[in-house]
């Protein structure tokens, strides 16, 4: 159902959605040069002077084109998403775009829920390996990300193609913090899971508390193999460079403390000699 109204109305409707994590695409303004949406929701757009290079490339290669297609298709369908083919915006679906915000006359807007979003994470049937980044971003024009993950071959050890996949397997995001995400994964066979989170160095993956390898898929997302059964998968932002910086800082502080103690010791000894 559509709720038409001011920006406050659409904000309230989307904020009332208690789904733990999703993204919003604002088509009612300059998508990549406004930050109001990002203030209230996780946004596909928003302005940032230092946007990640890969995400910027995805905007130019896929997202902008899909946005235009969505705007046209949904408008022609009168807002009825059942009349809109999901094949027209696969990248927006893999980015967990749950709501589109559409402009109306009189400065009003309407939020339209996307029934085709792939959610926070999903099992794929196959992994398609490519030789380089150019082939990776190009392959997204031809695959269905709900079924296939495109992986640069340099991540072939971290993201293996599963022999079989449980189509009834479930993945649920159970906790979300900016630097810590937890998922409950349950499947009979295990398989390759793609997570709708940006792949970035410094994130560590764990299965039931034990560190596990993960790699990049679909040019910007994370992927890993999860074994059969019920497991807790966790991602923590714990960059090793930060630990190195902390170690250097502690060593520097220790040296400074020793120098200060030595200086005070010499000052006291000098003062005593004068008294004597």
What are these regions (language model features)?
Residues 98, 107, 141-276:
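Active-site-proximal, structured, solvent-exposed surfaces of multi-pass membrane proteins
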Residues 16-31:
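Gly/Pro-rich turn-and-neighbor structural signature
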Residues 2-5, 9-10:
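Short, small-residue-biased leader/transition segments that mark boundaries at the very start
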Residues 1, 26, 30, 112-114:
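Transmembrane alpha-helical segments
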Residues 32, 37-131, 161-168:
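A cross-kingdom signal targeting lumenal/periplasmic-facing segments of multi-pass membrane
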Residues 10-13, 263:
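Short, low-complexity export/processing leader segments characterized by acidic and small residues
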């Amino acid at each position: 159902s559509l709720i038409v109204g001011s920006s406050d109305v659409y904000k309230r409707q989307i904020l009332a959605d208690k789904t733990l994590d999703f993204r919003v695409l604002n088509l009612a303004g300059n998508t990549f040069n406004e930050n109001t949406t990002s203030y209230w929701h996780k946004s596909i757009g928003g302005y940032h002077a230092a946007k990640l290079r890969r995400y910027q490339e995805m905007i130019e290669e896929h997202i902008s084109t899909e946005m235009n297609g969505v705007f046209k298709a949904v408008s022609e369908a009168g807002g009825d998403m059942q009349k809109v083919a999901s094949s027209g915006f696969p990248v927006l679906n893999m980015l967990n775009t749950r709501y589109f915000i559409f402009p109306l006359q009189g400065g009003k807007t309407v939020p339209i829920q996307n029934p085709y979003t792939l959610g926070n994470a999903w099992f794929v049937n196959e992994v398609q390996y490519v030789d380089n980044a150019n082939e990776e971003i190009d392959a997204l024009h031809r695959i269905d990300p709900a079924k296939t993950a495109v992986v640069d071959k340099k991540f072939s050890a971290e993201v293996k193609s599963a022999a079989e996949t449980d189509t009834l397997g479930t993945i649920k995001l159970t906790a979300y913090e900016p630097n810590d995400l937890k998922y409950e994964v349950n499947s009979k066979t295990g398989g390759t899971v793609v997570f709708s989170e940006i792949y970035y160095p410094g994130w560590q993956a764990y299965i039931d508390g034990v560190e596990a390898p993960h790699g990049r898929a679909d040019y910007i997302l994370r992927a890993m193999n999860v074994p059969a059964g019920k497991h807790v998968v966790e991602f923590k932002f714990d960059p090793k460079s930060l630990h190195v910086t902390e170690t250097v800082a502690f060593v520097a502080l220790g040296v400074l403390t020793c120098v200060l103690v030595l200086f005070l010791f010499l000052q006291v000894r000098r003062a005593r000699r004068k008294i004597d």
